[in-house]
Amino acid sequence: MPAKGVVDMTELSNLVAESLERLRRDKPLVQCLTNIVVANFTANVLLSAGAVPAMVDNPEESEGFASIADGVLVNTGTPYRETTEAMIAAARGAASSNTPWVLDPVGVGMSWRTRVVLDTLDVAAPAVIRANASEVLALAGTGASSRGPEAGDAVEDALASATQLVRHYGCVVAISGPVDHILDADRHVTVSSGHEWMTRVTGVGCSLGALTAAFAGIQNDHLIAAVSATAMLCVVAERAAERSAGPGAFAQALVDELFLVSPDEVGERGGLRDVTA
């Protein structure tokens, strides 16, 4: 990628397409420590995209499995004491083997859950933090308690906090919203594709965290990985909505379109834009 302030959109679109081609070829193994509401949908999203899910979320196996996985997702949507131990163990295993892991801090801002997230971050910094604006604000200590996926803070209000997290953890931060913002220390890209029904189906946002971990497993530039995952899910959401009567059919069509969409269409239709300051 070019230096700060010179993100070439043609090159970026090509890198997104190439990343999807590589994902489908290499079939990265993704360990998912995710919430009980979305586990099945998340696994199907990964399979249809071309990755291999492994829902290994117990403390006895998590650390060892993270060391052999290509990418790891830690999602705090429904934390229990045993699974929180597994999350910390997975972060430790990922760090010891340089496996990229993605944090999706669902509901951060509630006291115990925030402590779990911070304890996990103390073990190892993630490759990517994927969250909504309210979660970014809460994680940075600049917002109130989170309502999780239903939180209503504007993405633009969380950009300063996202920059703070980027600097503190040395990671990429991807903020989901009507327009997604993805930034690291040098670059800031937006993705403006997608469809409103993405918020009407349980698990779409959580599956984006898993998809980001899959791309991070095959793409060393983690900003490109996050942009690729976001663009892919948003483009297939548009395609799925075009042939669906409502959210139920949309959820099924979304899984189909992840399998059917071409890499070039993801790169070209993603609505990518450089907004690096």
UniProtKB/Swiss-Prot annotation:
Record key words, sorted: ATP-binding, Kinase, Magnesium, Metal-binding, Nucleotide-binding, Thiamine biosynthesis, Transferase
InterPro entries named among the record's database cross-references: Hyethyz_kinase, Ribokinase-like
Pathway(s) served: Cofactor biosynthesis; thiamine diphosphate biosynthesis; 4-methyl-5-(2-phosphoethyl)-thiazole from 5-(2-hydroxyethyl)-4-methylthiazole: step 1/1
Binding site for substrate: 55, 203
Superkingdom: Bacteria
Swiss-Prot/TrEMBL GO biological process terms: thiamine biosynthetic process; thiamine diphosphate biosynthetic process
Enzyme class: transferase
Transmembrane segments: none
Positions annotated to bind ATP: 130, 176
Gene Ontology molecular function terms on file: ATP binding; hydroxyethylthiazole kinase activity; magnesium ion binding
E.C. designation(s): 2.7.1.50
Reactions accelerated catalytically: 5-(2-hydroxyethyl)-4-methylthiazole + ATP = 4-methyl-5-(2-phosphooxyethyl)-thiazole + ADP + H(+)
Keyword Manganese: no
Biological function: Catalyzes the phosphorylation of the hydroxyl group of 4-methyl-5-beta-hydroxyethylthiazole (THZ).
Family of the protein in this entry: Belongs to the Thz kinase family.
Family annotation (HAMAP family): Thz_kinase
Name of the protein described by the UniProt record: Hydroxyethylthiazole kinase
Organism: Cutibacterium acnes (strain DSM 16379 / KPA171202) (Propionibacterium acnes)
